[in-house]
Curated annotation (Swiss-Prot):
Name this protein carries in UniProt: Acetyl-CoA decarbonylase/synthase complex subunit epsilon
Listed transmembrane segments: none
Summary of the function given for this chain in its UniProt record: Part of a complex that catalyzes the reversible cleavage of acetyl-CoA, allowing autotrophic growth from CO(2). The alpha-epsilon subcomponent functions as a carbon monoxide dehydrogenase. The precise role of the epsilon subunit is unclear; it may have a stabilizing role within the alpha(2)epsilon(2) component and/or be involved in electron transfer to FAD during a potential FAD-mediated CO oxidation.
InterPro entries attached to this UniProt entry: CdhB, DHS-like_NAD/FAD-binding_dom
GO biological process: one example: methanogenesis, from acetate
Lineage: superkingdom: Archaea
UniProt gene name: cdhB
Membership in a protein family: Belongs to the CdhB family.
Length: 159
């Protein structure tokens, strides 16, 4: 499958296209992982439920960047605020994450944040769990339709 062309890409290396088995290994290897949940994931009930199961299975801390009632998806925090804390290697929710998972945000926003993190924190493993490929992450799912994307999330959770 050819990778989509991204006119904003400023780095020569791109994200590894990863599926559920590889992502499971990456998640298990992390000591302190952080999930940043955006508005698209909050609005889609099935996506949101799968993320809550994924968070429980891999013991991830979570930050929700969208208005959401409840704290199932973590503390409310803006994506820029979370990115600034990550770039400065400051604790986010009391931990110094070694893995950050972006899901549910717009692709251009996710890409910009990941470009900044790639420059400021090369030691941080960055994963994009969106239906669109994100070249600035270390690992990203390929561009797929919503149904295939949810199947990948189900495979990650083990459903």
């Amino acid at each position: 499958m050819p990778l989509p062309r991204d006119p904003t890409l400023i780095y020569t290396d791109k994200a590894e296209v990863a599926r559920a088995p590889v992502l499971k290994m990456v998640f298990r290897r992390a000591n302190d992982s952080l999930m940043i949940v955006g508005p698209r994931a909050v609005e889609d009930e099935e996506w949101r439920e799968l993320l809550m199961k994924l968070r429980e299975e891999f013991r991830m801390s979570a930050v929700c960047t969208a208005p959401y009632k409840g704290n199932d998806l973590g503390r409310k925090m803006g994506i820029v605020e979370a990115a600034t804390l990550l770039q400065r290697d400051a604790p986010v929710l009391g931990v110094h994450p070694d893995l950050v998972v972006f899901t549910g945000s717009r692709t251009d926003v996710t890409d910009r944040v990941l470009q900044g993190l790639r420059h400021a924190r090369p030691d941080l493993v960055k994963v994009s769990l969106n239906p669109e490929y994100c070249p600035s992450a270390d690992y990203s799912l390929p561009t797929v339709k919503r149904d295939q994307f949810l199947q990948e999330l189900k495979a990650l959770v083990g459903i």
